UniProtKB/Swiss-Prot annotation:
It comes from Rhizobium rhizogenes (strain K84 / ATCC BAA-868) (Agrobacterium radiobacter). This is Dihydroorotase. The keyword Phosphoprotein does not apply. The gene is pyrC. Substrate binds at residues 15-17, 41, 136, 219, 251, 263. The lineage of its organism: Bacteria, Pseudomonadati, Pseudomonadota, Alphaproteobacteria, Hyphomicrobiales. Zn(2+) 2 binds at residues 99, 136, 174.
Length: 346
């Protein structure tokens, strides 16, 4: 029986939601992950340090008994964000990053930034105090094809911002294109990228071939196969600029299976099994720890976890529930469309 022991991983991009959904999904993360950067796009969003403090308390209260898990809180950037509040949040140790959502780019992003100039006082303060900016890297202008949103964002928004504020530390979250990978590789400093589990596995065919498959629909949307292969190469390379951010995003089935379904894929429960499969398939099991457990902490200035987990490769396939039940409703679990043989021990 093959075994692989690695430092306990972290998730550098996670949606826990709130209320009954939070209570229903948090255990799938805290079972395997020590820390996670928590997305602030609630309704209403987490825009102040006081909001983040209250949300963190709700997360900790929802943790299953005995689980050790540290939520790393973020603030939702608006055109009215108070730079002093952001700085206080960082000084207190509460705030790990600030999240930029272009208005309308994804779930609950309508209160996001429309004019980046109006957010510059906060961004300048962040650059000064060394607080990272996490970006949803897509433009939302209607004339841009949805499959080109990331590349156009890099050219028209991100690169001008980084030239204007070269000392600002930026995380390109959920990179989905070779353009994004190449841009990160070309940067001399202050740029890194998170990659999701599902974007390593699916391309856009998964959503569209054989019928509309809403449980593979996410934002940024999965791209063509050449982009998926570029993501795989980056993730399995050991390059310290790339790390795991699952973007696990639960929605109840009625909100996915409808005429205008929500974007989001729920992967927290089986991410480590999926990743072990991917890295084994690419002959890179020795790089899994860097991607899931080492590169992220190094980027965010944190120590790696001392605790270890062990992955076991089983002869028989490992089964996960097709759906989970939460107090908010039924959530469909990501199906990688191949059998999984790696399991987390215990």
């Amino acid at each position: 029986m093959q075994k692989l022991t690695i430092r306990r991983p972290d998730d550098w991009h996670l949606h826990l939601r709130d209320g009954a959904m939070l209570e229903g999904v948090i255990g799938d993360t805290s079972r395997h992950f020590a820390r996670a950067i928590i997305m602030p796009n609630l309704v209403p969003p987490v825009v102040t340090t006081a909001d983040a403090t209250a949300y963190r308390e709700r997360i900790l209260k929802a943790l299953p008994a005995g689980d050790r898990f540290q939520p790393l809180m973020t603030l939702y950037l608006t055109e009215h964000t108070n730079p002093d509040d952001v700085e206080e949040g960082k000084k207190s140790g509460l705030i790990t990053a600030v999240k930029l959502y272009p208005a309308g780019a994804t779930t609950n992003s309508h209160g996001g930034v429309r004019n980046l100039d109006k957010a510059m006082p906060t961004l300048e303060r962040m650059a000064k105090i060394g607080l990272p900016l996490c970006v949803h890297g897509e433009v939302t202008t209607p004339e841009v094809d949805i499959f080109d949103r990331e590349a156009v964002f890099i050219e028209t928004v991100l690169d001008p911002l980084r030239q204007r504020l070269p000392e600002l530390k930026v995380t390109m979250e959920h990179v989905t294109t070779s353009d994004g990978i190449d841009y990160i590789k070309s940067a001399k400093a202050n740029l890194a990228g998170s990659i999701t589990t599902h974007h390593l596995i699916i391309n856009r065919n998964a959503i569209l071939v054989g019928g509309i498959r809403p449980h593979y629909y996410c934002l940024p949307v999965a791209k063509r196969e050449s982009h998926r292969l570029a993501l795989r190469a980056a993730a399995t390379s050991g390059d310290s600029r790339f790390f795991l951010g699952t973007d696990s995003a639960p929605h109840v089935d009625p909100l996915k299976e409808c005429a205008c379904g929500c974007a989001g894929i729920y992967t927290s429960i089986n991410t480590m099994s999926c990743l072990a499969h991917v890295f084994e398939q690419d002959g890179a099991l020795d790089k899994l720890e860097a991607f899931a457990s080492l590169n992220g902490p190094a980027w965010y200035g944190l120590a790696p976890n001392e605790e270890r987990i062990t992955l076991i490769r089983r002869v028989e396939s490992v089964t996960f529930p097709e759906k989970i039940e939460t107090g908010a409703g039924t959530v469909t679990v990501f199906d990688p469309m191949f059998p999984l043989h790696w399991d987390v021990e215990g």
